[in-house]
């Protein structure tokens, strides 16, 4: 195991391909100690309020996340200690009672729409990536994902996108692009960018 694990931040708009890019990196190093942690896992617990109120929460605002807890757990992993990561229930709009045990790794991919927005998170990262995808593609992907995986109606997805997701993208997510070391147009289909990133990671891991 490396003396200091590598932390890679991957961000971009909802439906922009962050997870696909993260998994492409993950799958490129099958023999390495590497894991992905999603900022979504750290949405705040909302079990104390009604379901109707949870639905109204702005999930694209920094205040929706317990980023303090995420930072605390990342520091534990950096120190070589395992953590129990929360598991978020998208259909109930709150944390579940379950957690996932994450052991320390050599490479930790931190993925989420706002992971470059918080300076404290950025300071923990060795490589910062922004996945830059066209707005039309992102909304189509979001509709497909939320209807199939999260059981949501088309009407609710479009309403949330126009009233919350799009404004928050321009207020918080897009401005964080200036902090990225690498901007990846077209996401995982940008093979050249993915190869360059993997080469950098491999050089750090000593696999070249």
UniProtKB/Swiss-Prot annotation:
SUPFAM superfamilies: P-loop containing nucleoside triphosphate hydrolases. The keyword NADP does not apply. Keywords: ATP-binding, Cytoplasm, Kinase, Nucleotide-binding, Transferase. Its EC number is 2.7.1.48. ATP binds at residues 12-19. Transmembrane segments: none annotated. It catalyses: uridine + ATP = UMP + ADP + H(+); cytidine + ATP = CMP + ADP + H(+). GO terms for cellular component: cytoplasm. GO terms for biological process: CTP salvage; UMP salvage. GO terms for molecular function: ATP binding; cytidine kinase activity; uridine kinase activity. InterPro entries: P-loop_NTPase, PRK/URK, Uridine_kinase, Uridine_kinase-like. It is found in: Cytoplasm. Pathway: Pyrimidine metabolism; CTP biosynthesis via salvage pathway; CTP from cytidine: step 1/3; Pyrimidine metabolism; UMP biosynthesis via salvage pathway; UMP from uridine: step 1/1. Belongs to the uridine kinase family. This is Uridine kinase.
